[in-house]
Amino acid sequence: MRSYSLIAPAKINLYLEIIGDRPDGYHELAMILQSIGLSDQIDVRSISTDSIRVHCNHPQVPTDKSNLAYRAAELMVRQFPEAFAKYGGVEITVNKQIPVAAGLAGGSTNAAAVLVGIDLLWKLGLTQSELEELGGTLGSDVPFCVAGGTAIATGRGEQLSPLPSLDNIYIVLGKYRSLEVSTPWAYKTYRQQFGHSYIIDTDNLAARASAVHSGAIVKAILHKDTREIAQKLHNDLERVVLPAYPQVLHLREVFANQEGVLGTMMSGSGPTVFALFESQQQAELVLQQVREAIIDEDLELFVTRTITHGIKVTSSV
């Protein structure tokens, strides 16, 4: 039976602006998304039965239909029934390294890897844009996870405009294992507290979303100016998450107070906080300093870096 191993990178938000409400009930967003080296490994294998099986090494990750990787396989079965009938079922094994419920798109990147893996298993020959379009029906982050690199994301996050890739900006990530922030809660609370400032007119919504293309952080990315990028980090959701989660706020403050940190911010709806560095040595030094400043076994810390790719095939059998 054929099989593929794929690398599924996490992502962080370098910029997240909530512009207003969309007619479909989602928020209109303007974001800059960045792939990072912290990754899961996904193995996708053909099996002789007409079923979908998911295995995962992490006890908190479900292996049933509530798992986005499972739903990605279901989507491919529905979309390509003839290929399913010809090649049989799929077994998916997730080796989880990305923290769960962390605002790092762990579920979305696993789903993206399954789409890419099944495309290869079933010899469908789908283009990247076709894979992204399929991914968009599963979740807002899935299209970016297919493509990876650095990109502006607008709409609900599924409309992508690639930017020149940022390579080798070093990052320290911090996340409390037992702490989760509900993404729906974060957006709902933001709407309750700051909805008065939302843009309502549809044309103005689109114009404001497109304004990010000429914004200061995009200019810094185009010039590959790491220090300026770090100074222009922005996340509207910090306005509701940080006051409600003192641990996240404290972690962010500890990062901000360390020498060598160019900038720090919460990623997505949290609770992961990240800091940017010019060198791996500085990142590793600050990781140790943060570990000494916050003595808590529940706190996970990782050193990683920006990367230029999304889903990547590492081997096939």
From Swiss-Prot:
Keywords: ATP-binding, Isoprene biosynthesis, Kinase, Nucleotide-binding, Transferase. The active site is at K11, D141. Pfam families: GHMP_kinases_C, GHMP_kinases_N. Its EC number is 2.7.1.148. InterPro entries: GHMP_kinase_C_dom (IPR013750), GHMP_kinase_C_sf (IPR036554), GHMP_kinase_N_dom (IPR006204), IspE (IPR004424), Ribosomal_Su5_D2-typ_SF (IPR020568), Ribsml_uS5_D2-typ_fold_subgr (IPR014721). GO terms for molecular function: 4-(cytidine 5'-diphospho)-2-C-methyl-D-erythritol kinase activity; ATP binding. Coiled coil: none annotated. It comes from the Bacteria. One of its GO terms (biological process) is isopentenyl diphosphate biosynthetic process, methylerythritol 4-phosphate pathway. It catalyses: 4-CDP-2-C-methyl-D-erythritol + ATP = 4-CDP-2-C-methyl-D-erythritol 2-phosphate + ADP + H(+). Pathway: Isoprenoid biosynthesis; isopentenyl diphosphate biosynthesis via DXP pathway; isopentenyl diphosphate from 1-deoxy-D-xylulose 5-phosphate: step 3/6. ATP binds at P99, V100, A101, A102, G103, L104, A105, G106, G107, S108, T109. PANTHER family: 4-DIPHOSPHOCYTIDYL-2-C-METHYL-D-ERYTHRITOL KINASE, CHLOROPLASTIC. Belongs to the GHMP kinase family. IspE subfamily. Catalyzes the phosphorylation of the position 2 hydroxy group of 4-diphosphocytidyl-2C-methyl-D-erythritol. This is 4-diphosphocytidyl-2-C-methyl-D-erythritol kinase. It comes from Nostoc punctiforme (strain ATCC 29133 / PCC 73102).
